[in-house]
Regions:
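ATPase nucleotide-binding head domains, primarily ABC-like/P-loop NTPase cores
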Residues: 28-31, 218, 286-287, 291, ...
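Active-site phosphate-binding and catalytic loops of NTP-dependent enzymes
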Residues: 80, 103-112, 239, 376-379, ...
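Charged, surface-exposed helical/loop "interaction arms" that form contiguous linear patches used
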Residues: 347, 351, 361-364, 417-418, ...
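Charged catalytic and DNA/RNA-contacting regions of genome-maintenance
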Residues: 1-317, 326, 330-333, 337-346, ...
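Amphipathic heptad-repeat alpha-helical coiled-coil/stalk segments that mediate oligomerization
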Residues: 193-200, 256, 267-269, 360-435, ...
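Extended, charged coiled-coil "arm/hinge" scaffolds of SMC/Rad50-like chromosome-maintenance ATPases
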Residues: 402, 485, 489-523
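Short hinge/gating elements
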Residues: 45-57, 206-217, 268, 278-282, ...
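Conserved phosphate-binding elements of NTP-dependent enzyme cores
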Residues: 2-6, 13, 522, 540, ...
Length: 853
C-alpha cells in the first residue's frame, strides 16, 4: 500500500482509481464514495485489525461504464495505470496517474453530451473588472471575456460551465456574487498572476504577442485563461495542439440578455419537467457539431445586419431548392463528430474505428462541396469555397488503415495489407504457423487414431494437445503430460513448443509494430488539425442553416425583414413553442403587434387571467430572437429594427436559498432592466407588482411604466398587467397605448378568444377561471358576492383623476386626514426628474411606513 499512499498524497482532492491487474481498486474514503455512487460492493481487508482497509473495485474493461457516473456526481477522478508489464518485472509494478478527469475536463464519450459543450470556466476579478475564460477540451474552443459582475454572471450561466476555477482568496466573495456551483476548484493567488498567465498563454501558442488574436494584454480574461492552461497541466493534459486560437466574446456584437431573460424565455431549458424549450422546437440539425453551434447562436443572437442577411439569404436559397435540402441533410446526417474526433487525435486517445469514421466523414466533404458548387447559390457558394476536401489526409488514411479496423488496437488488423513489408512478413509467419498447427493436428489424429484430439491454447501452458480419458492409452510415449482434468489429459510436444515460440513471437512483434505505425499515423494527422477544425466549423454552420430551412418548411415560417429602424411590426405572429404543442385540429391564433418610438412605444396589455397575455410577450421576444440568429420566423410578416438588448420580467418565482421573496426577485429583475436600458432595447414586463399589496403594486407598476416612457432611449415595451387602473396612463402619456386580449362573455362562462385588440379591459375574470378549475359552487357564489362588495367600496379606478398628471400621481390615496395632507405636501415638493429609480423605490417604502403608522 506504500505505493498507493505515495500517489494518493499527490492527488488528495481526487478519487483515485488504482490499477491492480485486471481491476481498478479504490481504498479508504474513496472506496466508500465509489461504492455509494456506483452501487458496487464495499469490502474490507484485514477486518478488525489495525491495518483494516476498506476497498471497492470493478473490472478494467468497465471503466467507461463507471467513469461517467463518478464525474456526473461531481468527482475529480485520477486514473492510475500500470506503467510496465507485470510479467517483465520481479519487483512492484511501476504505476502512475496518466489522466485526471474532472467535470470540466473530459474527452470520454460516456461523460460528454453530444449536443452540448462541456465547458471548464475560470473567473477572476481586479476590483470591479471581471474576467472569465471558457474551454471545451473536447472541441478545442477557448474563449475569453471581460466586463462587470452582471455581464460575467450572465456568461457563466449561459455557457453552463461544468466546473469553475476560482482564486482561493476570492472563495467567499465568489459564492456571495455568483451563488453556489456544484464543482469548483480553488487555486492559489500566484496562478492568476499576470506575468504567469501571459507566459502560459504565449508558450502554448508559441507567440511573443497576443496582438494576432486581437486581444489587449490588459484583458482580465487572460488571467482566467492562464489558470485554465495551468489546470490542464495539473490534470495531465499535455497534448493540446487542437487549441489553436483564443476567441474573444465581444459584448457589442451580440444581443444582450441577462440570465433572467434566458431563463424566462426558456431558450435552452424549460421551466417545467414536461415542457419544451425553444431549442427543443427549432433544432433540426443533423450533426452534433451543428447542434452545439445552434445553442451558441441562440445565446448570442447577432447585431450585424450583414451576417444576418447572409444567414437569411442562405436559408432562402435552400428552401427554394428542396432537392438540395434533402441531399444536404442526408450528407450531414452521415458525418461523425469531427470536432471531438480531432481532439482525440491530438491527445492520442483516438481508436482505430474512429479514424475510419474520420476518413468517411472527410470523404463526405467532397460530396457536400459538389452540392454547393452552383455559383447561382450566391451565399451557399461561399461555404463551398471555405471547405477543404482534405485529399491528402484521406489518401493517408486510405493507404494506412484497414477499412475493418477494430475499436481496440490490441485486437489487431488495424494497419492495411501492403502498407508495411515487415508487418506483412510477420503476419504471413503468424498465419503459416497456425496453418502448420492444423497440419500437426491432422497428422497426429491419423498417427494415433484419436479423431477427437484437439490442439488448444492458454496463458499457462501455451499450446497443448487435449485427449479424452477413453483414448489416453493411445498417447505416444514422447508426449509430455502437463495437466490432468476430470475427463481428459493435456500434453505438450517439443514440436508444438518450437512453433509456439515462432507464432507468439510473431504476434507480439505484430502488436508492437501495429501500435507504432498507428502512432505514426496519428502524429501525421496532428499536423492537419487546423484544416479539419475549419471544415468542422463550416459544416456546423451549414447544418444550422439547413436546419432552419427544414424548420421553415415544416412550421410555415417566413423570412423576416431586418433593418436599423426603431420599429417592430409583426403580422399574424405565433408562439413557436406553444404552436408546436397544439393538436393539429387546434391552430394557434395569431396576433398583430406594432411598436415604435414615436407613437406606440409602450403597449399596456390587459385581459383576463389565462387569456394569453404572457404568451404574447414571450412570442414577441422569441420572434425577434429567431430573426436575429438567422432563422425564419413564425409570422405572416415581420419587420424588425435590430434589437440590441432584450429584458423580461415574466413569471412569479422566489429565491428562498438567498432569502429573497417573490417580490424581491421581481424588484431585482426590474432594477436590472431599469439600470441597463439601451438605445434599441425590447422590454417585456408581465404583472409587475403582483408580489405585494394592491396599492404598492399599482404604484410601482405605474412608476416603472412612466420611467420607461420618459427615458431618452424610449425602449419598446410590452407591459402586461392585471391592474386595469394602468389603462388611465394612455390618456396622459403620448406613447402609451392600450390593448387587450379579448374574450367573449356569455351568461355562465367566458370564452378566451386569444386575440389582441385595441383598448383596455376592465375585468380579470378570475372567478370564472376558478370555476373552470373546479372550485366548489358554494365557494364561487361566495366569491362573486365578495367581489360586488369590494367593487362598490374599493374602486381604485374611480380614485384616479384624468385631469392632469400631478393629480394622477396622488390619486392612489384618499387625502382626507392631516397625516396624508402632510404626505401630499412632501410628494409635491419632490423633484421627480432628479430621482433615480432606486431612490423612488426607497421613497415609496418610506410612504408605506408612514401610512401604516
Amino acid at each position: 500500500m506504500r505505493q498507493y499512499y505515495k500517489i494518493k498524497d499527490k492527488y488528495p482532492d481526487a478519487l483515485l482509481l488504482f490499477r491492480v491487474g485486471d481491476f481498478y481498486e479504490t481504498f479508504h474514503d474513496d472506496a466508500v464514495k465509489a461504492s455509494s455512487i456506483l452501487g458496487i460492493i464495499l469490502t474490507k481487508r484485514g477486518a478488525g485489525s489495525n491495518s483494516e482497509t476498506k476497498l471497492a473495485g470493478f473490472p478494467h474493461h468497465s471503466l467507461n461504464t463507471y467513469l461517467h457516473k463518478l464525474v456526473k456526481a461531481g468527482e475529480r477522478v485520477a486514473i492510475c495505470e500500470q506503467l510496465e508489464d507485470p510479467k517483465k518485472t520481479k519487483s512492484i509494478v511501476k504505476r502512475g496517474v496518466t489522466e485526471l478527469i474532472t467535470p470540466g475536463v473530459a474527452l470520454n464519450d460516456g461523460i460528454l453530451e453530444q449536443k452540448s459543450n462541456n465547458f471548464l470556466a475560470s473567473v477572476f476579478n481586479i476590483k470591479n473588472q471581471y474576467g472569465v475564460s471558457f474551454l471545451d477540451i473536447s472541441t478545442g474552443e477557448l474563449l475569453i471575456a471581460e466586463g462587470n459582475l452582471e455581464y460575467v454572471k450572465n456568461l457563466l450561466s449561459n455557457y453552463d460551465a461544468k466546473e469553475i476555477l476560482v482564486c482561493k482568496k476570492n472563495k467567499s466573495a465568489f459564492t456571495n456574487e455568483f451563488g453556489n456551483y456544484s464543482s469548483i476548484f480553488y487555486f492559489d493567488d500566484w496562478v492568476f498572476n499576470k506575468d504567469f498567465a501571459l507566459e502560459k498563454i504565449k508558450n502554448h501558442f508559441d507567440v511573443s504577442t497576443l496582438k494576432g488574436f486581437g486581444i489587449n494584454e490588459s484583458n482580465v480574461g487572460l488571467l482566467a485563461c492562464g489558470s485554465i492552461l495551468h489546470y490542464l497541466d495539473e490534470t495531465q493534459h499535455k497534448k493540446l495542439e487542437h487549441i489553436i486560437k483564443i476567441n474573444q466574446i465581444i459584448d457589442s456584437s451580440h444581443v444582450w440578455m441577462d440570465q433572467f431573460t434566458v431563463a424566462n424565455l426558456e431558450l435552452i431549458y424549460s421551466n417545467s419537467k414536461e415542457g419544451k424549450s425553444l431549442i427543443d422546437i427549432i433544432d433540426y440539425t443533423s450533426s452534433p457539431m451543428g447542434a452545439r453551434m445552434l445553442k451558441r447562436w441562440l445565446i448570442h443572437p447577432l447585431l450585424d445586419l450583414k451576417k444576418l442577411n447572409f444567414r437569411h439569404s442562405s436559408v432562402d436559397e435552400i428552401i427554394k431548392n428542396k432537392d438540395l435540402l434533402f441531399s444536404l441533410q442526408s450528407e450531414l446526417r452521415s458525418l461523425s463528430d469531427l470536432e471531438r474526433i480531432i481532439a482525440k487525435v491530438v491527445t492520442f486517445k483516438i481508436s482505430p474505428r474512429e479514424l475510419v469514421q474520420l476518413k468517411e466523414s472527410l470523404t463526405k466533404v467532397k460530396s457536400i462541396k459538389d452540392l454547393l458548387s452552383d455559383k447561382s447559390l450566391i451565399n451557399l457558394y461561399k461555404i463551398n469555397s471555405s471547405l477543404d476536401c482534405c485529399e491528402s489526409i484521406i489518401k493517408l488514411l486510405e493507404q494506412t488503415l484497414s477499412n475493418e479496423a477494430p475499436v481496440n488496437i490490441k485486437k489487431g488488423n488495424v494497419i492495411k495489407e501492403n502498407f508495411n513489408s515487415e508487418l506483412d512478413e510477420l503476419r504471413s509467419l503468424s498465419i503459416s504457423g497456425k496453418d502448420y498447427l492444423n497440419k500437426i493436428l491432422e497428422r497426429e489424429k491419423n498417427n494415433t487414431g484419436i479423431t477427437s484430439l484437439k490442439i488448444s491454447f492458454n496463458n499457462v501452458f501455451g499450446y497443448f494437445i487435449e485427449v479424452r480419458n477413453i483414448h489416453k492409452d493411445k498417447v505416444p510415449e514422447d508426449w509430455i503430460r502437463k495437466q490432468t482434468l476430470v475427463n481428459a489429459e493435456r500434453y505438450i510436444t517439443s514440436e508444438l513448443k518450437d512453433y509456439e515460440a515462432k507464432i507468439l513471437g510473431a504476434e507480439e512483434k505484430i502488436s508492437v509494430l501495429e501500435s507504432k505505425l498507428f502512432e505514426d499515423l496519428i502524429t501525421e494527422l496532428v499536423k492537419d488539425v487546423e484544416v479539419i477544425q475549419n471544415n468542422s466549423f463550416w459544416l456546423a454552420n451549414l447544418d444550422c442553416l439547413v436546419g432552419f430551412a427544414n424548420l421553415a418548411l415544416k412550421a410555415k415560417y417566413t423570412k423576416p425583414i431586418l433593418n436599423n429602424s426603431k420599429d417592430l411590426e409583426i403580422t399574424k405572429g405565433r408562439h413557436p413553442v406553444i404552436e408546436s404543442q397544439l393538436p393539429q385540429d387546434s391552430p394557434y391564433i395569431p396576433n398583430d403587434l406594432k411598436l415604435c418610438d414615436k407613437t406606440n412605444q409602450i403597449l399596456m396589455i390587459t385581459g383576463p387571467n389565462m387569456s394569453g397575455k404572457s404568451a404574447i410577450l414571450r412570442q414577441t421576444a422569441l420572434i425577434v430572437l429567431l430573426a436575429q440568429i438567422g432563422s425564419f420566423v413564425p409570422a405572416e410578416k415581420a419587420k424588425i429594427g435590430i434589437i440590441d438588448k432584450i429584458f423580461t420580467r415574466v413569471g412569479a418565482s422566489d429565491n428562498i436559498s438567498a432569502g429573497e421573496s417573490t417580490f424581491m426577485v421581481e424588484m431585482n429583475e426590474s432594477a436590472s432592466i431599469i439600470n441597463n436600458i439601451s438605445k434599441n432595447s425590447l422590454v417585456l414586463l408581465d404583472e409587475i407588482g403582483r408580489g405585494t399589496s394592491t396599492y404598492d403594486g399599482i404604484s410601482i407598476a405605474w412608476a416603472i411604466a412612466e420611467f420607461l416612457h420618459d427615458h431618452p432611449y424610449k425602449p419598446k415595451t410590452l407591459f402586461a398587467t392585471h391592474y386595469h387602473e394602468l389603462n388611465m396612463m394612455a390618456d396622459s402619456f403620448e406613447r402609451i397605448n392600450n390593448v387587450n386580449v379579448s374574450v367573449k362573455e356569455t351568461k355562465n362562462s367566458v370564452i378566451f378568444l386569444r386575440k389582441l385588440v385595441p383598448g383596455g379591459s376592465a375585468h380579470s375574470f378570475g372567478i370564472h377561471v376558478a370555476q373552470m378549475a373546479g372550485m366548489p359552487k358554494g365557494l364561487i357564489l361566495s366569491a362573486k358576492k365578495m367581489l360586488k362588495k369590494l367593487e362598490k367600496s374599493h374602486n381604485v379606478g374611480n380614485d384616479i383623476s384624468r385631469d392632469n398628471e400631478s393629480e394622477m400621481q396622488l390619486s392612489f390615496f384618499n387625502l382626507d386626514n392631516p397625516k396624508l395632507e402632510e404626505l401630499k405636501e412632501d410628494l409635491i415638493s419632490l423633484n421627480i426628474d432628479e430621482l433615480t429609480p432606486i431612490e423612488a423605490l426607497i421613497k415609496l417604502n418610506e410612504i408605506k411606513r408612514i401610512l401604516k403608522s
